[in-house]
Amino acid sequence: MNKKLLSSIILVVFVDLLGFSLILPLLPYYAETFHANAFVTGLLVASYAVAQLIGAPLLGRMSDRYGRRPILLASIFGTFLGFVLLGIANALWILFAARIIDGITGGNLSIAQAYISDVTDAKNRAKGLGLIGAAFGLGFIIGPVTGGFLSQWGYAVPAFAAAAMSFINLALIFFWLPESLTAEKRAEMTVKKPAVTLGALFVALKRPFSGSLLISRFLFGVAFAIFQTIFSLYALTKFNLTAAQTGYVLTYVGVLSVITQGYLVGKITNVFREDILIVACIALMAISMVGWAMAPSVLVLLIVLAPTSLAGGVLNTLLSSTLTKAVAPQEIGGILGFAASIDSSTRIIAPILGGALLQQLGTWAPGAFGAIVMAGLFFYVRAQIYNHPIVLSFKQTQLEPAPVTMQD
């Protein structure tokens, strides 16, 4: 494992996510200045996900052919342009254009993951990829509160600050980050690979156990993405929180996420079977989403956010982990590709659906809808995943007390 290259790319990821997290919580406030209602704000958030769904796979293939470094430079330059356009926006359509430009060039994270795979060996790869989660959490601790603070001078200021982060990233990559793929490796990787087609996805969904996990991931993804994408709009509409106050709340959520991902997941998966934890997290999340829907005050909301973040973070990790254990080693890449496509679809559906529910029914509706989805998922998982022979087959490996590979 090349620690210098790994440290360099993790720094690039952190700076990129810092810029992203500066902006994301402020979009509903920015859109409101152009008289956008909740549904239109949901469309604004979804426009980025739609563009990213189109752009990220293309950028990923281009990075295989032309190398990680030039495509990462192009991707972050697109992010830079999107943030600048966001800062100078004087009409709602320009906000949409800014998010679409950022989304279509938004392959930053997937290319960084590929770079890490290039510079780590099989033993250390999981550890290297896990550092992205740490960078993500740290970015979401610092970014929202910084963006909220800067917004007191206008919403354009955080946008230009995010653009500055992207410019710094361009300089870091240009002057400091070497290419990770040799010409020989690029030639090998241009061999045509099986596409993640809609037909292939339907075939995967019909498989007895892994198909059930993918369906569970979709249902969980819709409920959790509604919480993530609508939260700022919910905070503005229900509690009239300022952008700065929402930033403080999201920083609190970021701290909870870092604790969950960095500490709790490893501890509890060494004690409990994964299917038991999945069922428990679904139940906890369903209950906490009822609390989110009905929270009468910000204090109650902060209390409710703790189990929501805990259950959501653990469940997201467990569904991915169980999915990779449920298929043959040569199928892992393909099944994770399907999971990524499902995640992208939930980030498109959730903000539109959540915005419509909030506008038409009220601030209680997104949380209530999420709770209903999670309650249905509870019974589905109990029937299809809990105590399944495949889960029981890898139970003993998980509980062994000498988990060197588990820690990696």
Segment roles from a protein language model:
Residues 25-38, 229-245:
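Short amphipathic helix-loop junctions that connect adjacent transmembrane helices
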Residues 178-215, 399-408:
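Juxtamembrane intracellular "pre-TM" segments in multi-pass secondary transporters
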Residues 97-137:
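Cytoplasmic helix-loop-helix junction between adjacent transmembrane helices
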Residues 53-92:
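Conserved MFS/SLC helix-loop-helix module at the cytosolic interface between two early adjacent transmembrane helices
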Residues 132-175:
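Helix-loop-helix hairpin linking two adjacent transmembrane segments in secondary transporters
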Residues 273-319:
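C-terminal transmembrane helical hairpin of 12-TM major facilitator-type secondary transporters
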Residues 56-67, 260-274, 358:
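Helix-to-loop junctions at the C-terminal end of transmembrane segments
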Residues 151-164, 356-374:
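A membrane-interface helix-boundary motif in multi-pass transporters
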